[in-house]
From Swiss-Prot:
GO terms for molecular function: ATP binding; CTP synthase activity; glutaminase activity; identical protein binding; metal ion binding. Pfam families: CTP_synth_N, GATase. Catalyzes the ATP-dependent amination of UTP to CTP with either L-glutamine or ammonia as the source of nitrogen. Regulates intracellular CTP levels through interactions with the four ribonucleotide triphosphates. The active site is at residues 378, 514, 516. Homotetramer. This is CTP synthase. It comes from Acidithiobacillus ferrooxidans (strain ATCC 23270 / DSM 14882 / CIP 104768 / NCIMB 8455) (Ferrobacillus ferrooxidans (strain ATCC 23270)). Its EC number is 6.3.4.2. The keyword ATP-binding applies. Pathway: Pyrimidine metabolism; CTP biosynthesis via de novo pathway; CTP from UDP: step 2/2.
Length: 545
C-alpha cells in the first residue's frame, strides 16, 4: 500500500511547491524508497497543451505522450521515476470523465454532484497514479482559498480519513515575507493560511516557509504555536541560487527524518553523495559559457524551463557556469544579429506561430555563416531547413506551411499520419482540433554513422520525446541534400527526417525531437553534452576565458 504526502500552498502562488515536493521526493528516494509524484491542476482545460506559454509556462511531454504541467519536469529531474499520463490531471479532465460516465448511465440515475462524484473521481485518479510506489507526493495546484481548488482539497481530506492512520501526511508551503520598512519578518500571512486550511478539515503536519532569508527560531516557534505544530515541523525554505541545493537544505533541517517518522517508516540514513557531487560541480566551475536562446516566449523564461535546466546540466558535467542570453526573436528582426555577438553557441527552441520567425531564421543564418555552434530543436530544426533552402539551395521563397500555407516551396509541411508511442496509427486533418492532435511522446530514431548525432549518443538507435504537427517534406530530400544538407536521423520506419546536420560546419545540428525532456542533473543528456563541448571549443577559438 502506498503512503501519501499531500503538498498544498498558501498566501500566494508560484512559491515552488513542485520543486519543494520533488526535493523531498529525492531525499526519500535516497533512503531506498520508490517514489512517484502527481500534479493536480484546478483549471478547466483538459490539459495544458493549447495554453499560452506566457500564461502557463512550458508544456512538459512525458514518454507516453501526455502534455503536462512543467512541474512534472521537476519531478523527473529530481527523481529516477518516469512520469506519465497518470501523474497529471486537471479539473477539466475530471469533469470530462464524470460527464462521460453520467452519459453512459454509470451513476444509475443518481443526481451527479461535486461530492461524492467529482471527489471520488479525483481520489480514484490519485490512487491510480500512486500504484506500485512506496510513497506518492501529491501536489495540489493553486493556493488554499481558491474556488477552483476546493474539490481537490476536499478529496485529499477524505483520503486522510479513508487511508490507514500514518499513511497520509500534509505538507503546506507558505510565505513569510520580510518587510524592509519594519525591519522584520511577518508570520501573520502564514497563520491565516494555516487557519484557512484547518477550516476545511486539514491539519498540516509540516510547514515549509518560503523566505528570502533564514527564519529565526522564535518566529518558527510562533508559527508552530498558532499552527498546532512543534518548532521542528516548521522548515525554512529560503531562496537559493540553484534548486539542486534544496534537498541538502531540507535534510540539514531534518525534514526527511520528520516525514519518515510521521509515516511510520524505519529506514537508514539517505545516501546524498549524488547531490553533494552536483553542488560541488556547481560551486567550482572552471570557466563560463554564453548560450544565446533565440525564442518567441523569452518574456517568461519558464516557457523554456527544461531547456535551461538541460543546458545547466551540461555545464555541470563540463565544469562550466552557463550564462543565458534570452533573445527575443523580434529584436533580431529590428536590431540585427549583432545582439548575438557575445554568444559562444546559439539555440533556437520549439514554438508555434509566425511571430518572430524571420528573426530566428536570421539567427540561424548567422550561426551557419559565422561557424557558431548551433542546436535547433523542433521548430528550430524546421527553420534551419527553411534557412538552408533559401540561402544555400536557391529556394528563396521556401517556408513551412504552418507559417505560409501558400508557399511555393513547402520544405516543412503538415504531418497527417504517424505512429503513437504504443505503435498505433494516428491521423490529423487540416482544420482539425488543436488539442491532443500532435505527434507526442517517446519515439525511436535511427542515427546515421559518422554523424554528430551518433558521436553524441554513441549508439545507432535512440528514443526521444516529440511534440509537433509539422515535418520535413520528403519531396525536398534530394534537392537539399545536393546543396549540402545531411540527414542523420530518421524515424523507425525511415519515413520522417528527425535530425539534420551541415558537414561543412564545426557543429550544426537540428533535431525534430525534444532532448531537454530527458535530461537530469545526475546524468545530463548526451546531445547537450556535445553541444556544450562545441560551445567551449568556440569560446577557446575566440580567445575568451
Amino acid at each position: 500500500m502506498s503512503k501519501y504526502i499531500f503538498v498544498t500552498g498558501g498566501v500566494v502562488s508560484s512559491l515552488g511547491k513542485g520543486a519543494a515536493g520533488a526535493a523531498l521526493g529525492a531525499l526519500l528516494e535516497a533512503r531506498g524508497l520508490k517514489v512517484t509524484m502527481l500534479k493536480l491542476d484546478p483549471y478547466i482545460n483538459v490539459d495544458p497543451g493549447t495554453m499560452s506559454p506566457f500564461q502557463h509556462g512550458e508544456v512538459f511531454v512525458t514518454a507516453d505522450g501526455a502534455e503536462t504541467d512543467l512541474d512534472l519536469g521537476h519531478y523527473e529531474r529530481f527523481l529516477s521515476t518516469r512520469m506519465g499520463k497518470r501523474n497529471n490531471f486537471t479539473t477539466g479532465l475530471v469533469y470530462q470523465t464524470v460527464i462521460e460516465k453520467e452519459r453512459r448511465g454509470d451513476y444509475l440515475g443518481r443526481t451527479v454532484q461535486v461530492i461524492p462524484h467529482v471527489t471520488d473521481e479525483i481520489k480514484r485518479r490519485i490512487r491510480l497514479g500512486a500504484a506500485d510506489a512506496d510513497v506518492a507526493l501529491v501536489e495540489i495546484g493553486g493556493t488554499v482559498g481558491d474556488i477552483e481548488s476546493q474539490p481537490f482539497l476536499e478529496a485529499i481530506r477524505q483520503m486522510a480519513v479513508e487511508e490507514e492512520r500514518g499513511d497520509t501526511l500534509f505538507m503546506h508551503l507558505t510565505l513569510v515575507p520580510y518587510l524592509a520598512s519594519a525591519g522584520e519578518m511577518k508570520t501573520k500571512p502564514t497563520q491565516h493560511s494555516v487557519r484557512e486550511l484547518r477550516a476545511i478539515g486539514i491539519q498540516p503536519d509540516v510547514l515549509l516557509c518560503r523566505a528570502d532569508r533564514p527564519i529565526p527560531a522564535d518566529h518558527r516557534a510562533k508559527i508552530g504555536l498558532f499552527s498546532n505544530l512543534p518548532e521542528k515541523a516548521v522548515i525554512s525554505a529560503i531562496d537559493t541560487d540553484s534548486i539542486y541545493r534544496i534537498p541538502l537544505l531540507f535534510h540539514a533541517q531534518g525534514l526527511d527524518d520528520l516525514v519518515v517518522q510521521n509515516l511510520g517508516l524505519h529506514l537508514s540514513a539517505p545516501d546524498l553523495s549524488v547531490w553533494n557531487g552536483i553542488i560541488n560541480a556547481l560551486e567550482h566551475p572552471e570557466g563560463e559559457v554564453v548560450i544565446a536562446l533565440v525564442g518567441k516566449y523569452v518574456g517568461l523564461t519558464e516557457s523554456y524551463k527544461s531547456l535551461a535546466e538541460a543546458l545547466l546540466h551540461a555545464g555541470l558535467r563540463a565544469r562550466r557556469s552557463v550564462r543565458f542570453l534570452y533573445v527575443d526573436a523580434e529584436d533580431v528582426e529590428t536590431q540585427g544579429t549583432e545582439i548575438l555577438a557575445e554568444a559562444d553557441a546559439i539555440l533556437v527552441p520549439g514554438g508555434f506561430g509566425g511571430r518572430g520567425t524571420e528573426g530566428k531564421i536570421a539567427s540561424i543564418r548567422h550561426a551557419r555563416e559565422r561557424k557558431v555552434p548551433y542546436l535547433g530543436i523542433c521548430l528550430g530544426m524546421q527553420l534551419a531547413v527553411v534557412e538552408f533552402a533559401r540561402h544555400r539551395a536557391g529556394l528563396m521563397n521556401a517556408n513551412s506551411t504552418e507559417l505560409d500555407p501558400q508557399t511555393p516551396a513547402p520544405v516543412i509541411t503538415l504531418m497527417t499520419e504517424w505512429s503513437d508511442p504504443e505503435g498505433h496509427k494516428a491521423y490529423r486533418e487540416e482544420g482539425g482540433n488543436l488539442g491532443g492532435t500532435m505527434r507526442l511522446g517517446e519515439q525511436e530514431c535511427r542515427l546515421e554513422p559518422d554523424s554528430l548525432a551518433i558521436q553524441a549518443y554513441g549508439q545507432e538507435r535512440i528514443h526521444e520525446r516529440h511534440r509537433h504537427r509539422f515535418e520535413f517534406n520528403n519531396r525536398y530530400r534530394e534537392p537539399l541534400a545536393m546543396a549540402g544538407l545531411r540527414y542523420t536521423g530518421f524515424s523507425a520506419d525511415s519515413e520522417l527526417v528527425e535530425v539534420v546536420e551541415l558537414p561543412d560546419h564545426p557543429w550544426f545540428l537540428g533535431c525534430q525531437f525534444h532532448p531537454e525532456f530527458t535530461s537530469n542533473p545526475r546524468e545530463g543528456h548526451p546531445l547537450f553534452d556535445a553541444f556544450m563541448r562545441a560551445a567551449i571549443a568556440q569560446r577557446e577559438r575566440d580567445g575568451s576565458s
